[in-house]
Amino acid sequence: MRLHQINLLVLCLGLLAPGLAHAEVRSFADVESGWAIPGYNDVRIPGDTGTLFSLTSGPISTASAPYFRLELGATFAERHTVYLTAAPLLLQARGTLTSDVDFNGSTFPAGSFVTGQYRFDTWRFTYRYTWWNSEALEAKVGLTALVRDAGITLQGGGQFEERLNVGLVPLFSFSFRWRFSPDWSLLLDSDALASGFGRAEDVQLALRYQLRPGLAARLGYRIVEGGSDSPNVYNFSLTHFIGAGLEVGLW
């Protein structure tokens, strides 16, 4: 991540803060849980000399797993929303290699039974501005600062290797909600960015129901996709999420 990108993100978020301290505040919590289903997960470490292999197809497969996400935030003066998101993910892989795999400086020989872990935990701070809010449509746009704490491990054939990766990524953030009845709405929610270093997308499409004022439930499909291609690490993955969420107004 280039330093000027981080500085620009911090500056943009900082410029949004003045004037909000004395505005009306409505806080909320959002909890989501469901099932994470692996799509693809292609790995080559180091990115220029390692063996390209998949954690989800061929001799190695990755099992689906439960997941959860938590958001805590507040809306100021009706149009300004800030929130923190915790979104951990841990997937387990296993299989028998059909050829040698060079991973993170070690060689895992063909015929070895291997186990692996793919961990992708993210912590996010998001600001969104409600630029349109009518009876039928609500639209918000903003920025997210995402802290990535990720790791890939491989064990077997007398070898164990782990590659960890921590970084800060700025993302564009937006949501669109179409209220097609007084209580029902369709929600499209996303954090995403693509650059020459890689890409990241977290997109959800959900059906939302307003149970009562300050309490709403949703059922939806989420996709998390992205990765990077560098001399040190090549990794691109896609994970599907089927989940239900509950939005609660706190005060």
Can you annotate each of these PLM segments?
Residues R79-V82, E135-L137, P182-L186, G214-A217:
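Repeated loop/turn-to-beta-strand initiation elements of outer-membrane beta-barrel proteins
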Residues R26-F28, A65-R69, F120-R124, G167-L171, ...:
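Transmembrane beta-barrel architecture of outer-membrane proteins
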